[in-house]
Amino acid sequence: MRASRPAVHPVEAAPPPPAAAAEGPEAQVEGAAHPRGVRMKDPPGAPGTPAGLGLRLAQAFFAAAALAVMASTNDFPSVSAFSYLVAAAILQCLWSLLLAFVDIYALLVKRSLRNARAVCIFTIGDGITGTITLGAACASAGITVLIGNDLNICAENHCASFETATALAFISWFALAPSCILNFWSMASR
């Protein structure tokens, strides 16, 4: 019976080869070949790193801020693009908080999140939420320009709130892009 593998693997440095350890540090620096099976360090911003946690928290913060600003207006449900932005911000906030908790766990137990399945799930999830968030931000930006510049009815609407929520959604997407790219790079480099 095969046992299941955990999704989080420890990353430890391999012991130096016996010949190199006996010759001293000069021999290790000059002609040392990396031992087989040793993984390189995770790049900053990858899942399970402090920078990755920072990116996830930034994504969640800006998505929550966009949601709060848009929900503070009473007429956002009348425009479907703004309702789409609210739904996308909720999804982005939940996804980012979920992965922030995973990053916190990985940092607390000092484990790496370079498992192929985990990286694949992170990449697909980041791609989906990123596409939805960018689409919602673009749609909201288009409606905001229509209301403000083309129809000139900002006096009747909350244009400043709409613009602020749209800008925060774009910032949330900009915080998501490095995570998605790093996850895709990690997945593709296997």
From Swiss-Prot:
Location in or out of the cell: Cell membrane
Compositional bias of kind Low complexity: 1-12, 20-31
Cytoplasmic compartment spans: 1-50, 103-126, 186-190
Residues in the Extracellular compartment per record: 72-81, 148-164
Annotated spans, Disordered: 1-31
TM spans (from-to): 51-71, 82-102, 127-147, 165-185
UniProt source species: Zea mays
Family affiliation: Belongs to the Casparian strip membrane proteins (CASP) family.
Membrane protein topology class: Multi-pass membrane protein
Oligomer status and interactors: Homodimer and heterodimers.
Keywords: Cell membrane, Membrane, Transmembrane, Transmembrane helix
One Pfam family matching this protein: CASP_dom
GO CC terms in record: membrane; plasma membrane
InterPro entries: CASP_dom, CASPL-5
Protein name: CASP-like protein 5A3
